[in-house]
Amino acid sequence: MPEQQYDTFSKFGKSFQEKLVKTILFDRNFANQMEEVLDTSYLELKYLQVFVDLLFQHKQSYPHPTYEAMVSVVRTQTEDYSDSIIKQVIEFMARIKSNAI
């Protein structure tokens, strides 16, 4: 029986995936479209999945978050995730802020 394959963005690499998530954060219209079609499991990296899940959850109750709002979300709503994942999310956000992505 052939192994079932799942589609992911892994073939596009880490840089592409991080830029995609950065665009979701900063472009509200794009984020609205992606929210309708993006299954976060397509993202290969767990910290990107967590970040996008947190962003989309925030959008359910509040307007599209700013970078600063996401800093607050990450500080207050990540208790269900491991310390290593939270650290990676924080490092990702630091790279966004420093324009390293």
Which role does the model predict for each range below?
Residues M1-I101:
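Noncatalytic partner-interaction/assembly domains of nucleic-acid and motor enzyme complexes
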